[in-house]
Each structure stands twice: as structure tokens, then as C-alpha cells.
Amino acid sequence: MKKILFRLFLSVFLVAAANAAAKTKVDIRPDGLYLTDVTVAQLEKQYELYGYKDYIYMPDWVYPPIFLTNLPTDFDRISDANRRNKLFLQIIGPLALKLRDELREERLAVRELRAAFLEGADLTPEQERFVEEKAVKYDIFTRMKGRRRYDILLKRLELKVDIVPPSLLMAAAAIESDWGTNRIVREGNSLYKELAWYTDKGLKPQDDRQDQSYRYKTFPSLYDSMKSYALRLNSSVNYEQMRLYRAEIEYREKPVFGRSLAHTMLFDSNLKNFAGLLDYTITFYELTNFDEAELGFVRLPNLEDKK
């Protein structure tokens, strides 16, 4: 799929808000435009400049790299549920594509290293550190030593370090966050109601009758929440069936779609029939389109001016 260049536009409305020392923060980076504490009106104006008027039907399925740190400050005041849901998907769609690309690069590094290892190459000390760090990250353990150790670690890493379809990430976020309206995502940027046990860090359950031994995890950004959730899917024993089924699809050289994995998500939520809810949400909102979509890239103004 071809990449599309998005010239970097900033709406006058958005720049004015930032320059007026408002809470709104605009961060221009080589990979995209990062926005913090924007209002719905500011965000929709910015989307309009990029032709991003709906979460689907973008030309060539290429999406502008506009990444929100948090949901708009007045997001929960949108009274029209249909409009609110569509804007929610517009917001998290680029984040899911960004994470998919990041996981794809991480997987490529693991696969290339394992391929060289299987051909007889010895790992350098730097490569050994890389493997050990990934093993800790993805909760992989073995008591074996030497070359046998890295054979086991790399094999297990190749199963775990893999993409999570954007449609699956988006549907799960919509369901768990009540389409971006619940307290957990508004106060803690937590899209998936992830829990932390026996700690004072995080958001307390509001109902005093609930178990007080846990907290809802909080995150610096929506993207950090999505990364944490994807890591859970790729590392926890509860999702081994999902990972094995994903590997089987890839072995047959087929694309991995969110709907293909939805039925394996039986232990992902306290909600009844969560797997069915995932399948329905992906289907009804046509989120499978995101599984084959790509992010465009921006050209910064100073680079454009030099040409």
C-alpha cells in the first residue's frame, strides 16, 4: 500500500488556543501531530483540514497521523451518541495503526535475529541483551543455558511478538471504555479498565462495596494504555489460544483480521459474551478496514520550504 504525504496543517483555531497559553498542547514530531487537551471543536477543525471527516472511507485507506494524548476535554458532553462513537473511532484509529506498525517492526527484528541464529550465527553480547530484555517484557522464562537457552527464547518470542489487529484494539477500547465516556478513561487515560492489585497507585473503584484491593491503572496517554493492553494479549497465559490461532493464520500466509481472533477472547473481560461483543462491534462499525489501512506521514513546514 502506498504512503500518502500529509502536509502539516494547523488550524488557526488550534494554534490560537495554544498560543494563548491555554491547556491545549500541540507537539509536532517527524512521525505526526500530537495533541493534548484539545476541545471537540478544535479537533474536528483539525480533522477537516486533513479531509478526515469520517473514521472510514479514507482515500486508499491511508489515515493522517494525528495522535491524541487524551480524549477531548469536553468529549463526554457530546449528546449525540452516534456522533460521539464515530469521533471516538476517529481518535483511536490512528493510535491503533501506529501500534500495529511498532509491533510489526519489533517482530521483524526478532524474526531476523532468529533466522540468523538458526543458520548457525552466534549472538553478540548486544543481541543477547536484546533477547533477554524481550524475554522479560513478554514473560518468557527458561532455566536452560548457552545456545539452547537462546533457541528456546527466540522461538517463544516469535510466537508472542506480533501484531494485534487494529480492529480488535479499537473494538475492545470502545466496549471497555463505554465509547470513551466512563470515568476510568476520562481521569486515567485507561481504555481497557486494566487492573493493578494490592497497590495505592491508580483510580479507586467508586463503589465502596466493591473489592478495595485493586485499582484501575492510569496511563500518561491513550497510546500507553493501548500498548499495555497489546502487551497483555501478547504475553499473558490467558491469551495463548489467541496467539496460537494467530500463528496458524500467518503460517497459511493469510492476513490476520480482528474478527478472526475475536472468538479467542473468552477471558478478556468480566462482560458476558465479550467475544461476541467484539465480533459485533467490528462488523457493525466496519472496523476490518483498519486492519488493511496505513498511516500517512507528515512533512514539516521547514522541510517543505527548503524545496
Predicted features along the sequence, with ranges:
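Catalytic cores of secreted/periplasmic lytic hydrolases that degrade extracellular macromolecules
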Residues: 20-171, 175-307
